[in-house]
Amino acid sequence: FGGKEKMLALGKYPEVSLADARARRDEARKLLANGVDPSENKKAVKVEQEQEAITFEVVAREWHASNQKWSASHSARVLKSLEDNLFAAIGKRNIAELKTRDLLVPIKAVESSGRLEVAARLQQRTTAIMRFAVQSGLIDYNPAQEIAGAVATAKRQHRAALELNRIPELLHRIDHYSGRPLTRLAVELMLLVFIRSSELRFARWSEVDFETAMWTIPGERESLEGVKHSQRGSKMRTPHLVPLSRQSLAILEKIKGMNGNRELIFVGDHDPRKPMSENTVNKALRVMGYDTKTEVCGHGFRTMACSSLIESGLWSRDAVERQMSHQERSSVRAAYIHKAEHLGERRLMLQWWADYLDANREKGVSPFEYSKDKKR
């Protein structure tokens, strides 16, 4: 070909029969007659066949395996979500042939079922998988980039929180709650440390260090048999440090006297091997006379604490955000904040918040006024 003698292997006998070899020879002659190099054509066909074998599922599994920093449980959840929602529709498709409209089909199906948060996560993961394909040299362009805005976002749920001038009323109702003592202490502690519900109800005694006055909520907890979601630790899946005020330590000491021999801090009403119900705090607030949808709910304590700390003007935004355990969008800034921790300031801040609540037991005072009084 091209004035040069070339050899073309037709296959080994007996794997390739004589009849097949003759057919391949004849095909090669046809290619030569059309000005096509049979050996180069053979290579091109082989490359094409290899590319056809690179499916969305193959790439998705490689992307999944590359995320080695994920916890085992999170990794398993991500893979199951891909298997349940994406692979059946586009898993066997050649990664290079997928268009934006193809990627949207399974995501829109999930959206149509009303699972908007799941659809949003699938959109993010599909984009990441296709980006991985670009970075791996499998495709030149990421068609998932065009999905942005095509999937409805879940309506942000409003968490009811009291106006700060109603804090004295809330404290009075907590102090006079006549239900289960452990429930009253749970509500009071949740207000003092303003952590999330699952972070509180799945808490273990092993996480609390009374000597250093520190509660370390792990990124993931050991699962409790028969208890759904009991592996949940901090929402950000990294250890969250909660400095304990004198008031918080006193509450934990009281609880320790009740069930310090148990693994869980907040044991269930009927079975001490299981945690209190996820509805315990909100149910107690309803017993106190509050509408947990319009007035205040357990999660609303976080809003009240955050508003008070900012209004006081005493604390840096970084310290407040770190204690709230909010996700920092900038990875560079997140790394800085995580490393710095602001622990010294946060210790003072949590003690100030506890003292501020005590001051409101005597008379109503705003965070700003209380901070001015403390400075005098």
Question: Which residue ranges define each predicted feature?
Answer:
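Short, charged hinge/linker segments at domain and secondary-structure junctions
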Residues: K30-K43, E97-R101, R131-A154, P218, ...
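Short, basic (Lys/Arg/His-rich) helix/loop patches that form interaction surfaces
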Residues: P168, H172-R184, V193, V242, ...
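DNA breakage-rejoining catalytic core of tyrosine-based enzymes
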Residues: E50-E57, R93-R101, L138-N142, T153-H172, ...
